[in-house]
Amino acid sequence: MKTFDSLYEELLNRAQTRPEGSGTVAALDKGIHHLGKKVIEEAGEVWIAAEYETDEELAGEISQLIYWTQVIMVARGLKPEDIYKNL
């Protein structure tokens, strides 16, 4: 099972090693504007899932929101510790 920290490390590794065919690398290459739109999209899907879907579907949408948020973190050079100090 992945954790917030292990997912971040995986995404950071992909950004650094740039494996061919990586969706994360492709998203990073599209820039912050694209990534921001994905975060907004996923946040909306979390809201809809919270209103109308099962807990399992909601958990899936929340995981996608966390993924895209972490891709933005990688793009901007933020580390989990930068987030933790604001919780």
From Swiss-Prot:
Please state the pathway this protein functions in, per its UniProt record. Amino-acid biosynthesis; L-histidine biosynthesis; L-histidine from 5-phospho-alpha-D-ribose 1-diphosphate: step 2/9
Task: Report the Gene3D superfamilies cross-referenced here.
Answer: MazG-like
Q: Name one GO molecular function term.
A: phosphoribosyl-ATP diphosphatase activity
Keyword Protein biosynthesis annotated: no
Tell me, which GO biological process terms does this entry list? L-histidine biosynthetic process
Q: So which domain of life are we looking at?
A: Bacteria
* Top EC class for this record: hydrolase
* One Pfam family, short name: PRA-PH
> Where primarily located?
cytoplasm
Q: What is its EC number?
A: 3.6.1.31
Q: Gene Ontology terms, cellular component aspect?
A: cytoplasm
Q: Provide this UniProt record's keywords sorted from A to Z.
A: Amino-acid biosynthesis, ATP-binding, Cytoplasm, Histidine biosynthesis, Hydrolase, Nucleotide-binding
Please report any disulfide bonds recorded for this protein chain, giving both cysteine positions: none
For the keyword DNA-binding, the answer is: no
Q: Where in the cell is it found?
A: Cytoplasm
- Write down the chemical reaction(s) this protein catalyses: 1-(5-phospho-beta-D-ribosyl)-ATP + H2O = 1-(5-phospho-beta-D-ribosyl)-5'-AMP + diphosphate + H(+)
Xref: NCBIfam families = histidine_hisI, PRK00400.1-1
| Family that this chain belongs to | Belongs to the PRA-PH family.
What is the name listed in the Swiss-Prot or TrEMBL entry for this protein? Answer: Phosphoribosyl-ATP pyrophosphatase
Source organism per UniProt: Corynebacterium glutamicum (strain ATCC 13032 / DSM 20300 / JCM 1318 / BCRC 11384 / CCUG 27702 / LMG 3730 / NBRC 12168 / NCIMB 10025 / NRRL B-2784 / 534)
Q: What lineage is on file?
A: Bacteria, Bacillati, Actinomycetota, Actinomycetes, Mycobacteriales
Q: Could you tell me the gene encoding this protein? A: hisE
